[in-house]
């Protein structure tokens, strides 16, 4: 099955890698959709986010053995992209539910499934940035 996930992936950390490996293990290929720089700014993560530009974030993700395809999206959510590629499995981190995940209803309606992968490590890019800044 084709697996799809998305995120900002600004400063890749162990939690991201474990999550992506778990997502890939659910199927035969993993597509990772990455928020464009403008999309990240719309999310309200801070005026200086993303720390790493889109091309850098995509290159780092593409270098992971568990990732088969990396694509970017400009919208606030990847709903249109999810509907266009219609994966069999849509994956998000453990704090998401099908009700709060863009595109989940469409995937499920088409016979696919939504999977929330539990967080394996207590990691956060936002917390890491705050720590580096001494906050």
Role assignments for model-derived ranges:
Residues 1-135:
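Nucleotidyltransferase catalytic core that binds NTPs
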């Amino acid at each position: 099955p084709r697996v799809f996930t998305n995120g900002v992936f600004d400063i890749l950390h162990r939690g991201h890698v474990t999550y992506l490996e778990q997502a890939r293990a659910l199927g035969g290929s993993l597509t990772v959709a990455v928020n464009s720089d403008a999309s990240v700014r719309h999310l309200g993560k801070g005026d200086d986010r993303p720390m790493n530009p889109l091309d850098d974030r995509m290159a780092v993700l593409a270098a992971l053995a568990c990732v088969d395809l990396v694509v970017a999206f400009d919208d606030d959510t990847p709903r249109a992209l999810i509907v266009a590629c219609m994966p069999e499995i849509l994956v998000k981190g453990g704090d998401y539910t099908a009700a709060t995940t863009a595109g989940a209803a469409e995937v499920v309606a088409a016979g696919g499934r939504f999977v929330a992968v539990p967080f394996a490590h207590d990691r956060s890019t936002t917390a890491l940035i705050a720590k580096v800044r001494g906050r």
